[in-house]
Amino acid sequence: MEQQKKKKRAVAFGLVAVVLIFWNLMQNTADQQKLKVACIGDELTFGTAVEEREDNCYPVQLQKYMEQAEKKYRIGNFGVEGAAVQKKSKKPYTKEERYESSTDYKAGLVVMMLGTNDTTEENWTDIDTFQKDYQSLIKGYQDLKSSPEIWLVTPPMIQSDGSTEMEERAKRVEEIKNAIETIGEKNKLTVLDLYSYSQKHPEWYQEDGVRLNKDGALAVADMVGDCIINKTK
């Protein structure tokens, strides 16, 4: 009698183990079926000073957008506060740990939004240097084994307060916007023009006129999300 009970318990445990193994396999398969999107950028991507950043930075809002649209996407936030494109800048993106993490992410889509910090006096060299280093950054992702699709997002315009410094930054970010469009055309990559999109929306910015607030982050998420949906119809 006792032996039979032991056999029944063993069978029960065996069935539970099989179910758990099957469930894990299903979960792993489901995760693999999700297209990974790597959001590359600076504090505008990371969500610096955005209210409740962990819920409202643009990559998280993009994840919510995809879930509401019932699309199987997994969004990764690889934004680095203070990061710039130029290799001689104070904080080159390619020297950051998150850059390495983004290349290991095996993304199917890379969304690059960099350039805002390149406009500062301490980071700026010239537009030719920016273009060269931006192209190098693109190539780093093009050479990945996962062969991700790459989208370029122009940085938003800078809301100048009239000071000499901000006026210079506003001019440089427009140069950068034009350079990114040229690079995108040359490489046959999708370019999302956040610069023009943001021109009439001062309400998207924090007080410094550079960083985006919660509404600005949502606008970026909607723009990227709309593009993903339209390209997968």
Regions found by a protein language model. Name each.
Residues 78-82, 198:
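Short, solvent-exposed turn/loop segments enriched in Gly/Ser/Thr/Pro and often Arg
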Residues 23-79, 98-104:
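Serine-esterase "nucleophile elbow" of acetyl-processing enzymes
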Residues 12-24:
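Hydrophobic membrane-insertion alpha-helices, especially the h-region
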Residues 2-15:
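N-terminal Sec-pathway targeting helices
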Residues 46-50, 85-88, 120-123:
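A generic structural signal for short coil/turn motifs at secondary-structure boundaries
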Residues 83-98:
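Charged, often glycine-rich, active-site loop that binds/positions anionic groups
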Residues 39-41, 82-85, 117-118:
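Active-site neighborhood of divalent metal-dependent phosphoester/pyrophosphate hydrolases
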Residues 8, 94-233:
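Alpha-helical cap/lid subdomain in secreted, periplasmic
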